């Protein structure tokens, strides 16, 4: 397979967005009880604990940037940035460069969550989603 530079290998880590979940399901509960209530609702809806994609708050975005100059590892986390700041930094990569994206389950989880959360924060992600997709899992 021929890859074009630059290449971005990336992954996100998420937690349940309790505030959005409480709003969506009209839960008037103490914050400490919201996650348990959301899990119960999700089990009733789908038989699984895994929350709907829009209810995943991004707490970390990490990437490996590969280009003609070398390799660079980066990470944006909730320790130093708000979710909106992490997304702004990550999405700005696509305004300047058009990297080849590599991820694990990116088209089914990471990219949809990034899109949902960008919309939630009023951010544009159009450059990211003009990438196309190569699915080697077939």
Which residues does each predicted region cover?
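Metal-dependent phosphoesterase core characteristic of DEDDh/y 3'-5' exonuclease domains
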Residues: 2-6, 56-80, 92, 97-138
């Amino acid at each position: 397979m021929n890859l074009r530079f630059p290449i971005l290998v990336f992954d996100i880590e998420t937690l349940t967005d309790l505030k959005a979940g409480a709003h969506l399901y009209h839960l008037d509960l103490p914050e400490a009880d919201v996650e348990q209530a959301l899990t119960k609702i999700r089990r009733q809806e789908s038989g699984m604990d895994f929350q709907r994609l829009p209810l995943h708050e991004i707490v970390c975005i990490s990437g490996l940037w590969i280009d003609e100059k070398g390799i660079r590892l980066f990470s944006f986390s909730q320790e130093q940035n708000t979710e909106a700041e992490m997304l702004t930094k990550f999405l700005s990569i696509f305004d300047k460069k058009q990297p080849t994206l590599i991820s694990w389950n990116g088209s089914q989880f990471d990219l949809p969550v990034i899109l949902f959360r960008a919309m939630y924060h009023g951010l544009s992600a159009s450059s990211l989603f003009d990438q196309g997709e190569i699915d080697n899992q077939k």
